[in-house]
Regions:
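Acidic/histidine-rich catalytic neighborhood
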Residues: 222, 269-290
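PLP-dependent aspartate aminotransferase-fold enzymes
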Residues: 2-9, 92-106, 110-229
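Active-site C-terminal subdomain of aminotransferase-like
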Residues: 283-335
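Short acidic, glycine/serine/threonine-rich loops at helix termini
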Residues: 157-160, 187-192, 243-247, 272-277, ...
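Active-site-proximal loop/turn and secondary-structure-junction residues that shape catalytic pockets
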Residues: 182, 239, 268-270, 297
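N-terminal entrance/gating region of PLP-dependent enzymes' catalytic architecture
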Residues: 2-142
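Active-site phosphate-binding strand-loop segment of PLP-dependent enzymes
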Residues: 211-263
Length: 335
């Protein structure tokens, strides 16, 4: 054992033989600091106790273990503490203990979800979890999904799949519709997809903050007259400000009649659809072609975590799967 496990260059990486004692020392010390921060939350409050945190650039030869942990403590003291019972201002719940362990294991394994051979167990776990969510949401056996680092990316994946499925990947007149209270991430998605601002059509809401069906029909008719082809309509299951739920069943009926992809942004409220809570009544999310679920909100899964569920996984595969000549493709799952 060394006196300073950080600066002993023999132990920069976990060893493939031996006890990994240096790693254990650092893990234990880190655990003690974070657990004390949790334990002190109620008496210290959710807001930072130190607002003078200073960022420091990496040094060529590193820092001692004591200096490093002093800076870690400063970082923690300058952080928002979601464990405090009064930290209810945003959708940032305390992390589940088991989720903290999951992050630790994922960091230690450091497997690459690019291909099955690089992450054999985790790739299968991802597929299994998405299938589980799909079944709980009422989708058929054809459904599946993919995990992503946040709701914005899940929404983006859904929109790209919808546009590709409609055969409008290169159509400059391809548009999609959202409510005026939909999440701001859709503006980002529009830009990333190479579309102009006017390719995103915002529909007015009613007095309750829900997408107005009369206004929706007006916008659809206008798009038809102007020769604009709609590749998706987005319904929100829990808007950011008011928690409003768009009329999913009525929107679904229009989408089926006009052969338009229905995507549900359930980043906030979607997680309730796997429960028996009253919010789940009369909300058939399985009517959609796709839905975004964010376990990091409300469910207590560590950031960032999001899942996109698609009613037919083959559409997602056809949209995003590519050949990887430098890795094995045998028994691959969607990554």
């Amino acid at each position: 054992m060394t006196s300073d496990p950080i600066n002993n260059h023999k132990y920069l990486f976990p060893t493939s033989s031996g006890s990994n004692e240096s790693l254990l020392i650092l893990l234990n010390r880190t655990s003690e600091i974070i657990c004390k921060w949790f334990s002190d939350a109620e008496k210290l409050g959710p807001l930072p106790i130190d607002i003078n945190f200073e960022c420091s650039a990496p040094e060529e030869y590193g820092k001692s273990t004591d200096v490093l942990f002093s800076e870690i403590q400063s970082l923690i003291n300058s952080s928002f503490n979601p464990v405090h019972p009064g930290s209810l201002a945003h959708l940032d719940p305390p992390p589940l203990i088991i989720s903290i362990l999951g992050d630790l294991i994922a960091a230690g394994l450091n497997n690459n979800l690019l291909a099955h051979e690089l992450s054999p167990s985790i790739s299968l776990l991802e597929e299994s979890i998405c299938k589980w969510f799909a079944k709980k949401l009422g989708f058929s056996d054809l459904a599946g999904g993919v995990a992503a680092s946040g709701g914005t990316l899940s929404n983006l994946n859904a929109l790209v799949a919808a546009r590709n499925h409609a055969g409008l990947a290169t159509d400059p007149k391809a548009v999609y519709l959202i409510s005026e209270d939909a999440h701001s991430s859709f503006v980002k998605c529009t830009s990333i997809m190479g579309l102009e601002k006017n390719n995103l059509i915002k529909v007015k809401t009613d007095k309750n903050g829900c997408l107005d069906m009369i206004e929706l029909n007006k916008n659809i008719d206008k798009c038809t007259k102007e020769g604009k082809r709609i590749f998706a309509i987005v319904a929100t299951l829990g808007t950011t400000i008011r928690g409003a739920i768009d009329p999913i069943e009525r929107i679904s009926k229009i989408c089926k009649e006009r052969k338009i992809w229905l995507h549900i942004d359930g980043s906030i409220g979607g997680i309730f659809s796997i429960t028996n809570l009253p919010i789940n009544r009369n909300i058939n999310v399985n009517l959609a072609n796709s839905i975004t679920i964010n376990p990091q909100k409300i469910l207590g899964i560590t950031k960032t975590s999001s899942i996109l569920i698609v009613s037919n996984i083959e559409i997602l595969i056809n949209t995003f799967s590519t050949g990887l000549p430098y890795v094995s493709t045998e028994n691959n799952v969607l990554n």
